[in-house]
């Protein structure tokens, strides 16, 4: 699919106020973000976290604050569990969403520990038989097209442009970007990992490199 020029906000009848923006780095904002997730935004979390359309508001959005220590995993977990206990059996659908959220907090710790135990995953493949599977060098134009969201694949490009503009993207779409780069473009995961690490507001090495290798 041939790429067109990126339209301006005026062309799309959008005001600058409607453009996505980065999250504000404050502890008070971290706590309020978690609370709005627990009290309202997260009601359909387990059903809406996979879509790039609904995930923007239905996901917790506290990952940047966890990465920079403005709120801890323990604190987020305790607040979430306290709120879940208050629900009781009154809302099974919402309780399921909170359980899904709590499990992801545990995964957060699991992957960080994995890097502590095996720091080589940042630079070497988890399974040595896959080393040198893809060339370490690539056509720079191909890599640039992927990095800038100009591959010609609408879904891929939309997600990459959104990430580049906001610094955030939901997990399923992150996985899609990596798998597309690895299998369709046959790019080495170390090349793509660097760009994504620079874009993610919530970059956390332990999670990042484990997921990059799993998806590639």
Could you tell me what each predicted segment is?
Residues 74, 113, 121-123, 183-188, ...:
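Flexible loop/turn segments at secondary-structure boundaries
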Residues 81, 85, 110, 116, ...:
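Hydrophobic alpha-helix feature that most strongly marks membrane-spanning transmembrane helices
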Residues 130, 134-137, 147, 195-216:
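C-terminal, helix-dominated tail/subdomain
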Residues 63, 141-144, 154-164, 174-184, ...:
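Contiguous, well-ordered alpha-helical segments that form the cores/surfaces of helical PPI scaffolds
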Residues 54, 58, 64-68, 72, ...:
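Secondary-structure capping and boundary motifs in well-ordered enzyme cores
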Residues 103, 111-165, 169, 176:
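A contiguous catalytic/ligand-binding core that recognizes phosphate-bearing ligands
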Residues 1-131:
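Glycine/tryptophan-enriched, flexible segments
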Residues 191:
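Active-site capping/gating regions of soluble enzymes
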